[in-house]
A protein has these predicted regions:
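A short, N-terminal "cap"/entry segment at the start of jelly-roll beta-barrel domains
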Residues: 1-29, 42
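Short histidine-centered beta-strand/loop micro-motifs
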Residues: 20-24, 33, 41-46, 88-90
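Structural motif
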Residues: 29, 52, 59-61, 68, ...
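Hydrophobic residues on conserved beta-strands that form the core of alpha/beta folds
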Residues: 30-32, 98
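Short, conserved beta-strand element in jelly-roll/cupin
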Residues: 34-36, 45-62
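Short acidic-glycine-tyrosine-enriched beta hairpin
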Residues: 67-81
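Ligand-binding loop in jelly-roll beta-barrel domains
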Residues: 82-99
Length: 99
């Protein structure tokens, strides 16, 4: 099958794994994540690819090149290639779920 079709909201809510790859193609990867309360993805940089992230559930912060941005349900983050970034779950109670 070419392409990938899913109910991304349902897949994100249901995911309990830190990182689960749903689909990979030559130029794109679809991943759902669940970050435990107080957890983070860890600072990283992708030299040659931009990233798009969307928060489905929870509260957190995005840190892009040292600048912090508050996040909650429905927020999206676009991370340009070469940008140091981290996503942190600021809740003490619920997982931060995103794709």
């Amino acid at each position: 099958m070419k392409g990938y079709i899913t109910d991304i909201e349902k897949a994100t809510f249901a995911n309990e794994d830190f990182r689960r790859v749903l689909y990979t193609s030559k130029h794109q990867q679809l991943v759902v994540m669940s970050i435990v309360p107080g957890g983070e993805i860890g600072e990283e940089t992708h030299a040659d690819v931009d990233q798009f992230l969307r928060i489905e559930v929870g509260q957190g912060k995005a840190i892009l090149d040292g600048v912090e941005h508050e996040l909650s349900d429905g927020f999206s983050i676009t991370v340009p290639a070469g940008t140091k970034h981290n996503i942190v779950n600021t809740s003490a109670e619920i997982p931060l779920k995103l794709y």
